[in-house]
């Protein structure tokens, strides 16, 4: 398997599609929000990017759950392995592509985490704490949790709930075997990354980001569920429900995405410290040069 990872706005999808076309294979998404139907602009699905040379590259684990659903690592592992086995059975090496570091690390290492039940006592104790306080509490549990996507109090409380359960119920099951993968990271300097994020955010607003969230609210999805998803869905929902003005919404969201990208890179550097070999490629290289660099590594590892 080939794994393509990197922070938001670095061009992961473009590279994965180019490789999949060249290798005649399929992609598995590792994005914790692209699994939801109807959440398109804010998650950057860019489905047109999967068209190349008159061919649509299949991408698994996109649009598999309704918006408003709660998805987790436990569910992702099962869905990933179904897609992974299906692709292997058809004689292809899958390409895993995304920015949710915990999903990527879990499937590569073969972590098996249980479906964690709610803990009302813990939730009551954590209610009223700020996101900063909750993030510090979560950090004390160590590396095995996806802190990159925790940008609302509700998500942070759920993350602590899972971490607390795992601490008290150690899981060493090998239900999911480790996967050997060539890991490619797209490296983008900070200033360029920040500019891309800001430019993309402006583009998403012009493409109908606010209308997308309004449509989700009008369809009956509770505001608190959209806030739970964080980033665009959190901030635009706050704007549409009158809890902030447009300027504050935009600047707050822009800052949150910059912080999110920084947390993603922190996670990937942590993966390297935990023993993963990541081959970093300049995200500013032309697509064909990126593809050639990966093909050389793929051939050397084959």
UniProtKB/Swiss-Prot annotation:
**Record carries keyword Manganese:** no
Q: Which cofactor does it need?
A: Mg(2+)
Explain the purpose of this protein: Catalyzes the transfer of a dimethylallyl group onto the adenine at position 37 in tRNAs that read codons beginning with uridine, leading to the formation of N6-(dimethylallyl)adenosine (i(6)A).
Q: What is this protein called?
A: tRNA dimethylallyltransferase 2
Q: Which family does it belong to?
A: Belongs to the IPP transferase family.
Region Interaction with substrate tRNA, as annotated, extends over 31-34, 154-158
**Encoded by which gene?**
miaA2
Bilayer-crossing regions = none
Task: Give site residues, Interaction with substrate tRNA.
Answer: 100
Which positions does UniProt annotate for ATP binding?
Answer: 6-13
Q: Does the keyword tRNA processing apply?
A: yes
Q: Which EC class is this protein assigned? A: transferase
Q: Name one GO biological process term.
A: tRNA modification
Q: What is its EC number?
A: 2.5.1.75
Q: Which organism is it from?
A: Porphyromonas gingivalis (strain ATCC BAA-308 / W83)
> Which annotated residues bind substrate?
8-13
* Signal sequence segment: none
Record-linked Gene3D superfamilies? P-loop containing nucleotide triphosphate hydrolases
Q: Name one Pfam family in it.
A: IPPT
User: Which reactions are catalysed by this chain?
Assistant: adenosine(37) in tRNA + dimethylallyl diphosphate = N(6)-dimethylallyladenosine(37) in tRNA + diphosphate
Give any GO molecular function from the UniProt entry.
Answer: tRNA dimethylallyltransferase activity
Assembly, in brief, is: Monomer.
